[in-house]
Regions:
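Fe(II)/2-oxoglutarate oxygenase catalytic core
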Residues: 1-155
Length: 155
């Protein structure tokens, strides 16, 4: 089963910042299985953030929980892997500063909360839920962590 969100050929859009939009990024049967097995109760059991509107289940939990549907463990494992990291860097190679000096060395990449402190680049895969808010949006314009090289969203 191919869980790679970049399995379709895509072009980097440069304006207003380097990004990609991939319609139907996963085969429908894979997406449907992820949707049908989404661990809503587990995500909602985490400590709420952002004044109680945001719940996050991070890679350290997704990679360790034995009761989790296998597809979610595999999805998280792939999207925190060296292979995934390399594919994203390859896609955005013209836009990533050379100062990062990654040199494609596997021991420099590890999943946040799972890898030890010796890695240079930490990856993460999170399941996030926001409380429904009817008056306004729960996410105003913002910058994520300035230490992040990239972030991706799957809806």
């Amino acid at each position: 089963m191919n869980l790679n969100l970049l399995q379709k050929k895509t072009t980097v859009i440069k304006d207003p910042y380097p990004h990609v939009v991939i319609e139907d990024a996963l085969p429908w049967d894979v997406y449907e299985e992820l949707e049908n097995t989404f661990p809503e109760n587990a995500v909602l059991s985490t400590e709420p953030l952002d004044q109680g509107i945001c719940y996050r289940w991070k890679a350290d939990k997704l990679l360790q929980e034995v009761y989790k549907p296998q597809i979610w463990r595999e999805f998280c494992a792939y999207h925190t892997s060296v292979e995934w990291f390399n594919s994203v860097l390859e896609l955005f190679k013209d836009d990533i500063p050379p100062q990062l000096n990654y040199n494609n060395q596997a021991h420099h990449v590890g999943a946040r909360g799972w890898a030890d402190d010796s890695v240079t680049f930490w990856t993460d895969c999170q399941l996030v839920m926001h409380k429904p808010i009817t008056e306004t949006t729960s996410r105003t314009p913002h910058l994520d962590n300035p230490m992040e090289i990239f972030a991706g969203l799957l809806y």
